[in-house]
Amino acid sequence: MSHTRAVVLAVACLCLILVQVEGTWNALDPEQMRFIHSRCFEDNLPAGPKRALYASKWIKWELEPNDETTHCFAKCVLEGIQLYDSKSKKFRSKRITIQHEAYKTFTGANDDEVAKYKQAVAALRVGSGSCSDVFNTYLPVHKQFHDVSQLVYLSVSAVAAKIYEADPNVKRKGESFAEYCAKRAWDEKTKGDACKARKYELTGSNELKAAIDCIFRGFRYINENGFNPDEIVRDFKLINKPELEPQVRSVLSKCAGEKAYEYYSCLLQSNVKEDFKHAFDFRELRSVDYSYLVKGNVYDPAKLKEEMAKADAKVC
């Protein structure tokens, strides 16, 4: 057994033990971290002349300018990495240990420093739970433990690169979730079925069902809380179809079954099927580069058609 493989297996076993202590929570990998940060950028980065200023600070996890916009961005990230729980209005310090132990072979984070960081977070008490309240509560800890928290939460590029190299199961940068999932569902013998899937044919094959389940999870249509229709509605809005929300929710609520392929089939057999294809394609395109919208790109039907033709050509 190679040293790298042994390390990965040891980490996996340790994570399993820790997960049993902290419910069912798993440490977040680099792909998950990138998604969380990019989504918080999308939802909080302002338009206008100061957009670049905010982006230049936030990308380095420098919580400036000190205003409501930055406060809400910080709260978004803290909730996203599940260090802060908005429902209970409490910080989850135990998860720092789980995150650290899972990747410390790659991060090199000091155990004592991480323990101090965890202790500091455990002592935090939140009041109203507003953006400013959460921000001001966490800020002193952020300033004191900026560097170690960056390591623990895989925000250092060199650390993420090591993990990508060691773990082939993490989706790569520049790879769409459709491509990532297809590699795990189909092989050369079932390539024809994969091509049909690119054309939105409902073949009902086990491979297609596995691929759709994988994609739905990658697109966050299914998350740790189960099926997430809000995420699908969001994708319709991003192709400039907000008026379809009632229809989309109606289709999903009436869909028999609770599996990804069943929801996928319901949408493709509904009166919103063509718009769903566009929304699904646009999500695939954005999954290649999580900063797609942050960079100022918008839905462009002609460009999307061109990019999907390229993706189809790789399979068909």
From Swiss-Prot:
User: Keyword annotations for this protein?
Assistant: Disulfide bond, Secreted, Signal
- Top-level taxon of origin: Eukaryota
Q: Which Gene3D superfamilies match?
A: Pheromone/general odorant binding protein domain
What is the annotated signal peptide range for this record? Answer: 1-23
Its GO CC terms?
extracellular space
Function summary: Modulates blood feeding of female mosquitoes on vertebrate species by binding and sequestering different mediators involved in the host response, such as biogenic amines and eicosanoids. Binds serotonin, tryptamine, histamine, leukotriene C4, leukotriene D4 and leukotriene E4. Does not bind octopamine, dopamine, noradrenaline, adrenaline and prostaglandin PGF2alpha.
Name by which UniProt lists this protein: Long form salivary protein D7L1
Organism, per UniProt? Anopheles atroparvus (European mosquito)
Q: What's the source species' lineage? A: Eukaryota, Metazoa, Ecdysozoa, Arthropoda, Hexapoda
Gene it is expressed from? D7L1
